[in-house]
């Protein structure tokens, strides 16, 4: 229900539940915590480095890119190329002598010097001296960056093996601390990966069990990522994934219960939330886990569904008569969630756009855990925010709970909490080799080092205390609930609205979409030439057979001699007149609206006639809609007013655009709607008459698109529809000399034929705008992250069976 809920309305509902005013004693306590944190962090080189190079700057991001990628590079030459690429174009000199730390200033001097020496010096006559400096500088810089990476690894990675981690954790119990060991950084890409990770978890359970034997309480636990246990952990594969994933997780959970090692299921991306809850419910409901109480769940408060999931978990625990530990976190994938929602064209974001809204939702979830959920849900509060910590402490709950922090962060805060209140703290502890866990590390640093986060702000003495102790509700009431810098996904484009997509990874939206798509199976379609409003039918039409199931979609009446001759005669009569630009562009905008209105039918046709997957069919309709709005705006921009060009004194050069005349548009089958619409609307927007010739394999889609175009107000004199065999139509039309431009997308061979015909049969130059097939290659060196590279390569090469001009 709350997945894509209106953020303004949801946050307002939250605000209505926070009427209380904080007293002076609360502010005094939070201030004391913050001052203690600042005093401790002032001695940390890493904290000072992150303060100077915060992750809202180009330099900060560059350092993270180097940290994440340089460690993978095995050879000096590639490492040097990476350093030159990343260091030479940044403003390192602005950071020199800005920090109170000698070591941070030294690093700034080194980076500034490196950047200057590594940057190409086009004005210097002596390349030999420059080359020598580059070589010396690269060696020094490479060593310095390598040292910085090792420092970061030592700070944020708990140990390289689980055995080493257990040894490191021995000293924690007397400080009322324990660990939650995370064995991995990223997800499984192959079945071999999944098996390897399963075995790593299985082995870790044995080792942690031995370490827990000496403990009275505060048992160490293991965090498990479901994406590590199956390479296709995604909703579209749920019928295959669910039984296999449940089996693997249940095996680990049963062993964990036998060894008395608590486990926690990590939260991941929002689109995986539903399938994760199905897995969790299936495993928790198994009889072998009855009455255990150490199977934990992670809830992310930046998600709008966090509070409703807590209610669901409470009901599940009540039904099963068990307790469920809940680790409440802010969330680790915010940047990706925002980007994905924008790419998909969703109506809303699944996460809050304001950090203060996430903080407020966290407090609401914490309140539920300490009140209504207290008998079934065991709270584990993971936060580095001193305000949040003090707020939870002062709820005066009798419920026992623990705090949690990330390895390398929040140590000074929880040392104070332990000393003042004796509340235990669990350390989320990544385990693994540095080069394997650096992507995880960078994500955590970006998440917690962004200039809006408490971890960053508390380090900056320039940020006044009153900003750090302000209730998130007070901030949201006094400012904007919505983030002014993050428009809704439909509003991210400047000149026109982003096309609306569908969240097919969510079961509710998927089934709603299919309920609207499937009824079109009952329709019977017809494709036939349309010339000046007249439809040309033939005696023996061919069946339009779906490549999906072999069923007939309707009939194809291909253009034959009568239709082709009528088309030539229509062009020769030349009665078409250019319409007003504003009327044309308004009609093209209405075409976009019509595509949106009929999108479920068009999705059906793209799937059944072109053989597209559901997601690709949705993307096809969206791209067609975007083409309409884009070309409409471009026409308004270039045709509305003349452009005065630069010229010499006494001379005036004026650029005006005008229609070319009749444009023949020939579109392919692999993008039967998007490219068809794109070609036609681009030509129409410029005031031309258009002859649209679609691919034979997808004539029904094109016919339906033409009907939508006519419904939008484009005259039947301005658009002629000519489906049929390519050469039978194209050759006589070009030979007639009545075509003034050709737009073609298809094979290189066909494009060369058309080019030759234009040359042979026309006395004047006739433009050919051709986008033809190509062979594509991707270059990836050792700086690339394999976990990101491989999925993109597979999608490019095999999505749509590789039938795209951009496919690998």
Regions found by a protein language model. Name each.
Residues 1-501:
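Positively charged, amphipathic and often flexible ligand-engagement surfaces
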Residues 253, 366, 680-681, 730:
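Generic hydrophobic/aromatic pocket-lining and core-packing "Φ" positions
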Residues 372, 652-654, 720-743:
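A structured beta-alpha segment of the ubiquitous adenosine-cofactor-binding alpha/beta core
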Residues 436-438, 444-565, 569, 578-594, ...:
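Terminal low-complexity tails and localization/encapsulation signals of metabolic enzymes
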Residues 641-715, 787:
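Conserved small-residue-rich beta-alpha loop and adjacent elements
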Residues 708-713, 735, 741, 748-808:
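ALDH superfamily catalytic-core signature
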